[in-house]
């Protein structure tokens, strides 16, 4: 009988497919965020995760790029698309901050400072660890911020504007594919990094998965109420 730890013949194929699915999922997510931001005249990703994400893509796409043939082009494509997301956010975020005039008047400055601060954070992690380790921990930080930030943005707005089921699923499934890829590499000894055997890593994964699942539940609840309200309005 084949030992359970022996790498299957299809290992590389599965890992590459999962990596590609993750990259495509996030590309689709950025495209949809830009579309819904312009359609609904709002921003789809909350401000701090947006700053952290684009800073991560800038650092690991330009300042400290991966030597892997596929990884760098994917990150650069994310960076280009995310610039459109940031542009839409700066253009339409004042619509969401009428209750806070000080923030509303200085949103471009706040985005600039936020991106600069997050860039410094990612660089500091590289200086503390090696680039590959910092790459993973920075990505985990971005993922946790994005998932929790998205959930609380949805709760605060009490509205599904700027979002959709496809937008949510592209992010969620893209991230899940990335986790499955890393889990396979860890299981078969192809990764030198701690994964599910590390408590902090396992906690971060659990935290963003729970947050993203709750996002789907809350989105469904809000969308159902919106559709019911629209139906009543038509009936009147």
Swiss-Prot record:
EC number, UniProt record: 4.2.3.-
GO molecular function, one term: lyase activity
InterPro entries, alphabetized: PaxB-like
Subcellular location as annotated: Membrane
GO biological process: terpenoid biosynthetic process
Main location, first listed in the record: membrane
Name the record gives this protein: Terpene cyclase andB
Originating organism: Emericella variicolor (Aspergillus stellatus)
